[in-house]
Amino acid sequence: MSKRPSYAPPPTPAPATQMPSTPGFVGYNPYSHLAYNNYRLGGNPGTNSRVTASSGITIPKPPKPPDKPLMPYMRYSRKVWDQVKASNPDLKLWEIGKIIGGMWRDLTDEEKQEYLNEYEAEKIEYNESMKAYHNSPAYLAYINAKSRAEAALEEESRQRQSRMEKGEPYMSIQPAEDPDDYDDGFSMKHTATARFQRNHRLISEILSESVVPDVRSVVTTARMQVLKRQVQSLMVHQRKLEAELLQIEERHQEKKRKFLESTDSFNNELKRLCGLKVEVDMEKIAAEIAQAEEQARKRQEEREKEAAEQAERSQSSIVPEEEQAANKGEEKKDDENIPMETEETHLEETTESQQNGEEGTSTPEDKESGQEGVDSMAEEGTSDSNTGSESNSATVEEPPTDPIPEDEKKE
């Protein structure tokens, strides 16, 4: 059996007019693979632009350049990687890288400077090595070979373009050289049958489910152990999540129960208060308001009557008091007019006798004291008369009377 072909997409089939009339060709089989139908673009060999090796032109590979210097962080990571990996064997690669990144950030500037100095020194060496590399004979030979190959490819592309402009066929199909096909005297019918069976056999192999296993799907023992640890950690995490879900569900049920209890208690209290509510009769309230207004009006009328009666009683009591005061004033006036004459005559006699008796013995101080006593008595008499006149001024005005000293009254 021939080698299994690559999975290259098939090109668009050529029209039937361009199919060659070679012996052994039985129509166009759309299921045939391209690797078993030798086709060339442009009609002659050396013009296959899909693979440069088919035309005999190969672009050489450049020589290996010097390695670039490692960055300071990569130097530090390479230095402490084994230590961190040994202290944390269960962690993943990205977790170890995260730890090393934190350690690098925690370093001081002096500690980082060591790695920076190494990087700068290697960088200088790298620049010198690159200069020597670019001037090396191998690199110069690579440049020359590359330029020649590119020129040949450009020439080939120009030739292909010219052939396409002249109308030459874009694609021609030639029979493939298959070791299964051998000419042992069979007719064209047998050859076509063999080709048909071969093509179907190849198609069945291509479309079958049995493929070469991928290298990445091969699991090693170390990988299995890592996967087992990951499975265990995932199971532990799953159990934690389930426990948290149970706790959340319990708290939710507890809150729900409290809400239901509070709702029931509120409904019961509402029913009790609704049963205790008082029905308001607006007609009864209006009747009570009217009755209260009537009582208030009656009390107001009674107070007004009492005030009017008190005013009448006060007026009736004022009239006899005025009459009594007027009578008393007239009697006093009569009594004062009668003794006025006798008192005047007696006063003159007493004053003369006193003057005669006191001319030899009296002192100026005694005279002054006597005169002050007379004046004070006169003032008292006037004040008494004024009080009497003020008490009776509402009804009768009494005529002014002469003041009488108190000594004369005593005599």
Curated annotation (Swiss-Prot):
Q: What is this protein called?
A: SWI/SNF-related matrix-associated actin-dependent regulator of chromatin subfamily E member 1
User: Per the database entry, which stretches of residues form a coiled coil?
Assistant: 220-319
Q: Where is this region: Disordered?
A: 1-23, 42-70, 153-175, 296-411
Q: Where is the composition biased (Basic and acidic residues)?
A: 153-168, 296-312
Q: Which domain of life is it from?
A: Eukaryota
UniProt modified residues of type Omega-N-methylarginine: R4, R40
Q: How is it modified after translation?
A: Ubiquitinated by TRIP12, leading to its degradation by the proteasome. Ubiquitination is prevented upon interaction between TRIP12 and SMARCC1.
Which species? Homo sapiens
The gene from which this protein is expressed is SMARCE1
Provide the GO MF annotations for this entry. Answer: chromatin binding; DNA binding; N-acetyltransferase activity; nuclear receptor binding; RNA binding; transcription coactivator activity
Enumerate the subcellular locations listed in this protein's record, separating them with semicolons: Nucleus
Per UniProt, subunit arrangement is: Component of the multiprotein chromatin-remodeling complexes SWI/SNF: SWI/SNF-A (BAF), SWI/SNF-B (PBAF) and related complexes. The canonical complex contains a catalytic subunit (either SMARCA4/BRG1/BAF190A or SMARCA2/BRM/BAF190B), and at least SMARCE1, ACTL6A/BAF53, SMARCC1/BAF155, SMARCC2/BAF170, and SMARCB1/SNF5/BAF47. Other subunits specific to each of the complexes may also be present permitting several possible combinations developmentally and tissue specific.
Could you tell me the keywords of this UniProt record?
Chromatin regulator, Coiled coil, Disease variant, DNA-binding, Intellectual disability, Isopeptide bond, Methylation, Neurogenesis, Nucleus, Phosphoprotein, Ubl conjugation
What does the record's free text say on domains? Answer: The HMG domain is essential for CD4 silencing and CD8 activation; mutation of this domain blocks thymus development.
**Some GO term, biological process aspect, for this entry: which one?**
regulation of nucleotide-excision repair
The record's DNA-binding region positions are 66-134
